[in-house]
Amino acid sequence: MDLDQKLSTGELRVDGDMTIYRANEVAQTLFASVRAHAGDVNLDLSDVTEFDTAGLQLVLMARRMVESNGHRLDVVRPSECVAEVLELCNVAVTTEPTQAAA
């Protein structure tokens, strides 16, 4: 899993797998990045290739961390596998790319 950080603009881009098999690795990197940024976060998951409920839990935990500081985390440009899990679990954490950029 790679995490491209553009924290000056509040954008984090994750690629690769976000599954139970990589949950610890993803969590450490993602949460450290979220803690380092004191503002709204756009989490770009367009290059995520596998996503399961462990990945969903990581996204929800990251969102809770950001919201506890009075800010917002949005998933932008979810890949197909991410969108499928979000829809299946009836979870709304996405924002249209045009809304996220505004």
Region annotations inferred by a language model:
Residues 1-51, 60-102:
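STAS-like cytosolic regulatory interaction modules
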